[in-house]
């Protein structure tokens, strides 16, 4: 027995009234779930959010120091202008009115289209979404993507499903209140409520052309290349080429555009012709108001929070202003902040320990794929080739983004928001068609998260997630493999989930499977879909809400693969120490190694949500609720049954033949 090491395990919240085999998530976290009160300014809280709180405090220290010492700097100018509530109140509606004047003055649909593009470049929500990213069939170059947008509610389902009727009614009231505050409905000879009802009706029609969350996961269906100079011909009705020019993207120079949801573009192009200009202008005003509401006087901030915070998420109190100010700086200058953050908060030895963990996870995947009994050699060879080409990024980028051409103005919040958004817009537009920057990160080092990028075939772990409860360099290996090891395995697993498996080792959307193997893969993943379709979070009504197994499939494969392979990787780490089996690993604090590994996963996902937030996320989030990121996974892993002596008849029990095994 070895009690010398820090186990990395917390047992203070265990609920012994609940058996591990009935509800492992609650067994590990039950007393915390029963007694913990979510802070009033958030809709969800837990272990992951402790990390986010720490990162936020660290970033606040950086931002406030720079804002005080260098008020003319980009960080100082933006933060101080956000925090200057006296000026914001005295300016009133004037900054917004300057911004929306082109909407009010648009005399033709062409003028309005140009205005929508200019406002989109300045960071306001509009009809069309767009971005530049890696071309999924030519992963050596960037390409411009056009996507569906235009809604003020989280998803198109809100506009058509009966269970959201109360939310929709509250949304209409919210729009009316905002128009009452601005007085802008009078410009259209409408009352605020008439304006709100017209806007909601218009958004409902836009929503009818949206792809749903499941269809939107189909990478092949969303890859529709069109020459930018042929967009008007392909989608007549909306002046797309004129819109692109106003955005700053010359169609002649842009080359190819990937249209993600062509039926959406066709639908709204037809709407553009058939709907009165006044309706489009009124709706565009609403887009501007809701985009800028967090930066207007307090009456707007409070009303915006009343709907998007209280009604949609159940949050009781608005976050402190400094937190919102830090978030605004993060949104505009994430890497400039990141460079400052890692200089203080990421010891180099963390990177070395992480690399060891990652390499063991990759080796465990290699061994697993090599020994899969359901895969033919032709597919196995391609899978191993893809695995060998994985790129790992840990901590922070080797090269930082250059912000030197962005100048922000002390004392002018709206101008700073516009300049920062335009800088980012131009950055994206300018690189369309360029070779891919292999050093780029899509997350800042101070972000508590991780990701897999299919077209780059890379896994990325920002510095801020490399802390307890997920990663503790002083803890026993079992806790780290159950924590950050599971996260690493999850991200690698995305390379082989139902979407990632469609990309080859070079990142191209290119089917490398034999027909026979993909049919077997689909059979196994379909069983996982059926399992998750039966789940409802403990705080929701199962008659109204269930997990969408198709929407969450990719993340569920990542979770199951991640924990299964983390267990194999831990065995590799034990073998390097001369320990040949899990059973021979040290017992620490009365827990076996396997128990500690599973426990670490369950404590890592210890979270609690408000019901309103849970309702929203179950509809739009591709991740399963956290309780099923634990229970839905462990019940499919044989070693869990052995570790906790789970008998047949337990609530989580699955017969061996019903346990899903993929990787």
Task: Cite the ranges covered by each PLM segment.
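Short secondary-structure subsegments characteristic of cysteine-rich extracellular domains
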Residues: 40-63, 188-209, 480-486, 589-590, ...
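Intrinsically disordered, low-complexity linker/terminal regions across diverse proteins
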Residues: 2, 237, 258, 262, ...
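Noncatalytic, helix-rich "gating/capping" subdomain that lines the substrate-entry/channel surface
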Residues: 64-356, 360
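Hydrophobic/aromatic-rich, well-ordered segments within soluble, folded domains that form packed cores
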Residues: 13-34, 158-180, 553, 560-565
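Short, solvent-exposed loop/turn and secondary-structure capping segments
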Residues: 35-39, 130-131, 155-157, 210-212, ...
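Extracellular/periplasmic catalytic domains that process cell-envelope and extracellular macromolecules
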Residues: 16-20, 136-138, 452-455, 590-592
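Flexible glycine/proline-enriched surface loops and loop-helix/loop-strand junctions
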Residues: 5-9, 152-156, 543
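Active-site-surrounding "flap" and adjacent substrate/cofactor-binding loops of secreted or lumenal enzymes
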Residues: 2-5, 18-22, 27-90
């Amino acid at each position: 027995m070895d009690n010398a090491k820090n186990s990395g395990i917390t047992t203070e919240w265990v609920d012994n009234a609940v058996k591990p085999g009935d509800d492992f998530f609650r067994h590990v976290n039950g007393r915390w779930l029963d007694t913990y009160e979510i802070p009033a300014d958030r809709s969800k809280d837990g272990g992951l959010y402790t990390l986010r709180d720490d990162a936020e405090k660290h970033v606040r220290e950086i931002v406030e120091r720079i804002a005080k010492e260098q008020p003319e700097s980009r960080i100082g100018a933006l933060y101080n202008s956000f925090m200057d509530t006296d000026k914001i109140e005295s300016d009133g509606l004037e900054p917004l009115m300057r911004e929306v004047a082109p909407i009010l003055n648009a005399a033709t649909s062409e003028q309005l289209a140009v205005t929508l593009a200019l406002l989109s470049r300045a960071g306001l929500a509009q009809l069309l979404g767009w971005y530049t990213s890696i071309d999924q069939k030519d992963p050596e170059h960037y390409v411009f993507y056009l996507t569906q947008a235009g809604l003020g509610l989280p998803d198109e389902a809100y506009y058509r499903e009966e269970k959201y009727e109360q939310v929709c009614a509250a949304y209409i009231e919210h729009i009316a209140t905002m128009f009452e505050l601005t007085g802008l409905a009078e410009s259209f000879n409408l009352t605020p409520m008439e304006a709100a009802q017209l806007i909601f009706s218009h958004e409902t029609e836009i929503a009818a052309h949206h792809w749903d969350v499941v269809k939107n996961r189909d990478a092949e269906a969303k890859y529709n290349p069109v020459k930018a100079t042929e967009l008007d011909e392909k989608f007549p009705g909306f002046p797309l080429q004129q819109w692109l020019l106003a955005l700053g993207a010359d169609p002649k120079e842009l080359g190819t555009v990937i249209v993600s949801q062509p039926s959406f573009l066709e639908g709204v192009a037809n709407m553009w012709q058939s709907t009165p200009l006044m309706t489009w202008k009124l709706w565009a005003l609403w887009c501007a108001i809701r985009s800028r509401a967090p930066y207007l006087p307090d009456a707007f901030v409070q009303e915006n929070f009343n709907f998007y915070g209280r009604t949609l998420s159940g949050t009781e109190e608005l976050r402190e202003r400094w937190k919102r100010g830090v978030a605004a700086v993060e949104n505009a200058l994430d890497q400039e902040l990141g460079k400052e953050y890692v200089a203080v908060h990421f010891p180099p030895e963390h990177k070395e320990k992480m690399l060891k963990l990652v390499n063991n996870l990759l080796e465990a995947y290699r061994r697993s794929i090599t020994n899969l009994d359901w895969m033919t050699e032709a597919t196995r060879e391609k899978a191993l080739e893809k695995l060998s080409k994985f790129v790992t990024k840990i901590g922070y980028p080797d090269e930082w983004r250059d912000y030197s051409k962005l100048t922000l103005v002390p004392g002018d919040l709206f101008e700073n928001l516009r300049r920062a958004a335009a800088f980012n817009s131009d950055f994206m537009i300018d690189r369309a068609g360029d070779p891919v920057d292999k050093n780029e990160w899509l997350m800042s080092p101070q972000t508590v998260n991780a990701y897999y990028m299919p077209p780059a075939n890379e896994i990325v772990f920002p510095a801020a997630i490399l802390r307890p409860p997920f990663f503790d360099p002083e803890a026993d290996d079992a806790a780290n493999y159950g924590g950050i090891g599971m996260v690493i395995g999850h991200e690698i697993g995305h390379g082989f989930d139902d979407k990632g498996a469609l990309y080859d080792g070079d990142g191209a959307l290119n089917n490398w499977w034999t027909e026979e193997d993909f049919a077997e893969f689909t059979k196994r993943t379909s069983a996982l879909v059926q399992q998750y379709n039966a789940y409802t979070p403990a705080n929701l009504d199962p008659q109204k809400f269930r997990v969408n197994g198709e929407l969450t499939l990719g993340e569920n494969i990542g979770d199951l693969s991640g924990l299964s392979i983390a267990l194999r990787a831990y065995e590799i780490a034990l073998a390097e120490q001369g320990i040949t089996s899990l059973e021979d690993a040290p017992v620490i604090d009365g827990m076996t190694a396997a128990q500690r590994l599973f426990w670490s996963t369950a404590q890592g996902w210890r979270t609690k949500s408000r019901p309103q937030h849970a309702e929203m996320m179950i509809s739009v989030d591709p991740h399963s609720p956290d309780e099923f990121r634990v229970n839905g996974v462990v019940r499919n892993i044989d070693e869990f049954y052995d570790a906790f002596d789970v008998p047949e008849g337990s609530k989580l029990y699955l017969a061996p033949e019903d346990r899903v095994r993929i990787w």
